[in-house]
Design a protein with these regions (language model features):
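Loop/helix-junction capping segments adjacent to catalytic residues or to phosphate/diphosphate-binding pockets
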Residues: 40, 117, 149
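Active-site-proximal loop/turn and secondary-structure-junction residues that shape catalytic pockets
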Residues: 109, 146-148
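A conserved beta-strand-loop-helix scaffold within acyl/acetyltransferase catalytic domains
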Residues: 47-110
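Acyl-donor-binding surface of acyltransferase catalytic domains
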Residues: 1-27
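Conserved GNAT acetyl-CoA-binding A-motif
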Residues: 131-145
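A short beta-loop-alpha structural element at the N-terminal edge
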Residues: 30-42
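Conserved acetyl-CoA-binding loop-helix of GNAT-fold acetyltransferases
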Residues: 107-112, 116-131
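Hydrophobic alpha-helical core bundles mediating ligand binding, dimerization, or RNAP-core interactions
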Residues: 43-46, 131
Length: 149
């Protein structure tokens, strides 16, 4: 839920240690990586959670920011319901400015009709599991703001 009445502040969280964890999903849900054609569903999800107001702008952002790097598509995770509809997303974003190897848990979102079921937690755990398997994968950052409570 987005609440723009709350003052905006940049909040950056840092994780220095990732523990092994079991990923638990509610019955009927699964997690998968990006597949060609997911752009429209991601755009609809971003509009449903209030992060975007235009499906076209959201889709363009996804294509330009995330599909421009072919290696990133295996790091884009979606929670899907029993019908295969995308109801959540998270990106295990790895950025390497000046050889620093920054890892970011990025664009975590769950459709309002599917919230409070543990899907966001499962998506975050999926990204963290990927980071944990990688060499030099720490720390992991999460940038957020009070609006997204």
């Amino acid at each position: 839920m987005i609440d723009r009445t709350i003052p905006f502040y940049n909040i950056i969280m840092r994780c220095d240690r990732i523990l092994p964890m079991e990923i638990k999903l509610p019955e009927g849900y699964s997690i998968r990586t990006y597949q060609p054609g997911d752009e429209d569903a991601w755009a609809a999800l971003m509009c449903a959670v209030g992060e975007q107001t235009s499906l076209i702008d959201a889709k363009n952002e996804f294509v330009q920011r995330y599909l421009a790097d072919a290696a990133l598509t295996d790091r884009i995770f979606f929670a899907v319901d029993s019908n295969g509809a995308i109801v959540g997303s998270a990106i295990a974003w790895a950025h390497d400015p000046r050889g620093m190897g920054v890892r970011v848990l990025h664009w975590v979102a769950v459709h309002p009709e599917h919230q409070r079921k543990g899907l966001g937690k499962a998506l975050c755990q999926t990204c963290l599991r990927l980071f944990r398997r990688e060499d030099n994968a720490l720390p992991v950052y999460l940038h957020t703001q009070p609006w997204s409570w």
